[in-house]
């Protein structure tokens, strides 16, 4: 999962000039590095806890990640390389300042919760040393004083670094990215060996009968099929591709097809890393079927000892810090007079409090799906505004042209899409959260185009000139 788009923040309110455009190599390295993150150590085991079969797992991952790559390539990058604006400035020109402020609030809250999940990942390392009780899959509340202290200590440390030393953390993250990829390969090799895989001749037999067996899910988990895996793999980064957050990233790309570089992150990162992480959980269950806890610290320690623990710390550290930084920036936009460091520190403390409650990390897949469901509609608005409005004789960037503080057509489309998603969940069950964003995208597009017609009719005839 992507957490920090490390591209420079220059040209925040103007198109990126040609001399600042970047080549393909920049994007291959960035995607490969940022998608082998702390979240992978949680998500991989959760597939296994969901009782997925080997075929559904591998086929779903392959197709879902392919759809994610195509979404970046066909939806995000073509607009990004034509307009070359940040997401926030692009939205401001369409929606008006007030709606962008609301978007920032929601985005900041989501980033804060995700940072809390990464703090939880790293805190599990302390549990290996101090032997306090750590959360299980079914836990929703703190499991004891030791857990609370470990999480708060980790969170405070991460918050201080995010507030004071982001440049150092970003440089460190880029430095260790190759190590992270290598270590996930090592995790996978060790996991498969311990499960009895000796070569390609018995790989599928072991994978389908001893690892991804397709049995009943762990208590409290949703049973996963091919469709669950496919849609989750596709939509776990929905905010970035269909949700258009990566307009800010690809505005620097020389060509729109550079978005194919996202395959490095999807297949080297998500595909490989999720498989590797889930094998570690299989090893744990083989040793003790009653030990269903999904805890990255113990999982990595059992595989690689102290080096495994170091990987967990680095993965959580390099993921949580840029996530806290982004959350701080989102909230600082609401109070420009406050220092970024102070806002980031407060945000980090809030993330630490959320991290105490294991329900966040144990339901990480559902949280990621909900995040996409809430923010995806604004990506649909951007898509419709750029490609569809001119085809129907309407003007793009209406808020900029008539100085609207809030584009009610965009706001209504956002609300209608979310309400439609919630309605589907109420009708068909909360376990369908991995699917509802697909039809809801079309709802957002249709509502925005229809209401934009009414909105633009209320302005002078030359508005569409």
Regions found by a protein language model. Give the residues of each.
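Membrane-water interface regions at transmembrane-helix termini and the short interhelical loops
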Residues: 49-51, 77-78, 94, 102, ...
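Hydrophobic transmembrane alpha-helices that form the core helical bundles
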Residues: 100-138, 316-333
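Juxtamembrane transmembrane-helix boundary signature
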Residues: 62-95, 104-119, 284, 447, ...
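Hydrophobic alpha-helical segments and their helix-loop junctions in multi-pass secondary transporters
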Residues: 123-124, 179-216, 231, 238, ...
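Transmembrane alpha-helical segments of multi-pass small-molecule transport proteins
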Residues: 132-164, 178-187, 227-246, 271, ...
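C-terminal membrane-solvent junction of multi-pass transporters and transport-like membrane proteins
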Residues: 379-465
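Membrane-interface loop-to-helix entry segments
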Residues: 149, 153-205, 260-266, 367-380, ...
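Membrane-interface "cap" regions at the ends of multi-pass membrane proteins
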Residues: 1-56, 212-214, 218-231, 250-258, ...
């Amino acid at each position: 999962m992507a957490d920090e788009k490390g591209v420079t923040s220059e040209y925040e309110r103007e198109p990126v000039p040609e001399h600042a455009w970047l080549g393909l190599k920049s994007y291959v390295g960035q995607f490969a590095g940022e998608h082998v993150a702390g979240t992978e150590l949680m998500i991989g085991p959760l597939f296994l806890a969901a009782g997925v079969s080997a075929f559904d797992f591998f086929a779903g991952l392959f197709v879902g990640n392919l759809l994610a790559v195509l979404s970046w390539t066909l939806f995000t990058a073509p607009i990004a390389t034509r307009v070359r604006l940040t997401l926030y400035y692009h939205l401001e020109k369409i929606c008006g300042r007030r709606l962008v402020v609301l978007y920032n609030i929601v985005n900041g809250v989501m980033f804060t919760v995700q940072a809390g999940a990464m703090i939880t990942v790293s805190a599990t390392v302390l549990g290996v040393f101090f032997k306090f009780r750590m959360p299980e899959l079914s836990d929703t509340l703190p499991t004891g004083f030791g857990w609370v202290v470990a999480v708060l200590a980790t969170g405070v440390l991460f918050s201080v670094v995010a507030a004071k030393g982001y440049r150092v953390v970003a440089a460190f993250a880029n430095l260790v990215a190759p190590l992270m990829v290598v270590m996930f390969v090592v995790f996978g090799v060790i996991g498969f060996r311990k499960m009895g895989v000796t070569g390609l001749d018995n790989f599928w037999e072991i994978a389908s009968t001893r690892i991804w067996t397709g049995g009943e899910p762990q208590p409290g988990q949703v049973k996963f099929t091919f469709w669950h895996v496919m849609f989750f793999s596709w939509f776990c980064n929905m905010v970035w591709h269909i949700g258009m957050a990566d307009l800010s990233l690809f505005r620097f790309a020389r060509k729109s097809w550079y978005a194919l570089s996202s395959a490095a992150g999807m297949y080297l990162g998500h595909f490989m890393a999720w498989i590797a992480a889930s094998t570690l959980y299989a090893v744990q269950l083989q040793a003790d079927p009653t030990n269903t806890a999904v805890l990255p610290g113990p999982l990595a320690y059992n595989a690689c000892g102290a080096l495994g623990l170091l990987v967990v710390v680095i993965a959580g550290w390099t993921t949580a810090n840029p996530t806290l930084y982004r959350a701080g920036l989102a909230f600082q936009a609401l109070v420009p007079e406050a220092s970024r460091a102070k806002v980031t520190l407060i945000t980090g403390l809030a993330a630490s409090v959320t991290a105490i409650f294991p329900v966040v990390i144990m339901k990480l897949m559902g949280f990621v799906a909900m995040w996409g469901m809430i923010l995806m509609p604004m990506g649909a608005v951007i898509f419709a505004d750029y490609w569809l409005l001119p085809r129907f004789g309407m003007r793009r960037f209406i808020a900029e042209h008539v100085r609207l503080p809030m584009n009610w057509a965009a706001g209504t489309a956002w609300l209608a899409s979310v309400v439609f998603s919630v309605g589907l969940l109420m009708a068909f069950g909360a376990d369908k959260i991995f699917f509802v964003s697909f039809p809801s995208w079309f709802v957002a597009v249709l509502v925005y185009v229809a209401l934009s017609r009414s909105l633009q009719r209320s302005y002078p005839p030359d508005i569409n000139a």
